[in-house]
Amino acid sequence: MARGENAVVAVVCGGSSAEAGVSRVSGRGVADALAATFRNVVTIEYDNAVGEALCEAKPDVVFPVLHGPPGEDGTFQGFLETLGLPYVGSGVQASAFAMNKVVAKGLFARAGLPLARDAVVRRGQATPSALDGVLMRLGPRLVVKPASQGSAVGVRFARTAAELAAAVKAAFEFDDAVLVEERIEGREITAAILERREAEALPVVEVRTPEGSWYDFEHRYTQGLSEHIIPAPLPPEQYARTQEVAREAHRALGCRDLSRVDFVVPASGEPILLEVNTIPGMTPTSLYPDAAKAAGVPFERLVAHLVERALDRAS
């Protein structure tokens, strides 16, 4: 196995998920940044020929930059393990846990982390009476999410029975299970985790979007539609608690190397944990690189560090 600047690094991106386009943008950025440290960086499309392409490239380490299933849910990670290839990021189990919001919330609850109240609606169970029961239990301000999508794909808000039924129907286009949560009013906050000697919480980021909008797919990936405030202007106790919960969520899922933990933080009280992303976006508008930069870790150094960790595990 080659080490140092002579290591062959394969950046795998793209695929067929709803987030494939974002993945390609992230992948190009990662590959360009890695080229500052490593002489041999190849970019490989995640398609039916990915195995053949990896065998031809003979990488010393793989850097998956894949968003959504089947690249982020443990499937590709398991494939790499069958090939005996070291890779950046969380392993099979943690990737699968994090991608499924229902499973992840079960693990977070077991760890005693602060969560929004929720209900799970599965395909074939979305009867009017069942949805009425969800409204009665959670109240009229709801967030509806496909269980296994990222980048806010398929997410809708609902206030009435009709809106809830429409939102659940739309979410079923992406998944067989839908997570319905009470909508908490507060700031949209994210805390990035980077493992060095230990899992370290980077500076907390607040995401601000124009009034009347929220951090949906368009606002995540369109220049100028969102503002990243670093460090997030939270009271000291909330700020510290957000970082603490982020570390605990990373550990609860068994994540490795890096993750991004999303929250809504109300005006007072606990930050509410929403989800953990095991392969955060690495685009020019993404949160994770901004948090790392604020911690004194420029993008080129960040991605090189992640590759070096994977190489160290394999040696």
Model-derived features: positions:
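A short glycine-rich, hydrophobically flanked beta-strand micro-motif that places a catalytic Asp/Glu
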Residues: 42-46, 178, 182, 256-268
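Phosphate-binding site of ATP-dependent enzymes
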Residues: 159-244, 265-272
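ATP-grasp fold ATP-binding core
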Residues: 108-109, 135-153, 176-185, 189
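ATP-dependent carboxylate activation and anion-phosphoryl transfer catalytic cores
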Residues: 2-7, 109-112, 235-315
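Hydrophobic beta-strand scaffold residues
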Residues: 41, 86-87, 115, 142, ...
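Glycine-rich phosphate-binding loop of ATP-grasp-fold ATP-dependent ligases
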Residues: 23, 116-120, 142-167, 188-190
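ATP-binding N-terminal substructure of ATP-dependent carboxylate-amine bond-forming enzymes
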Residues: 1-93, 97-106, 110, 122-133, ...
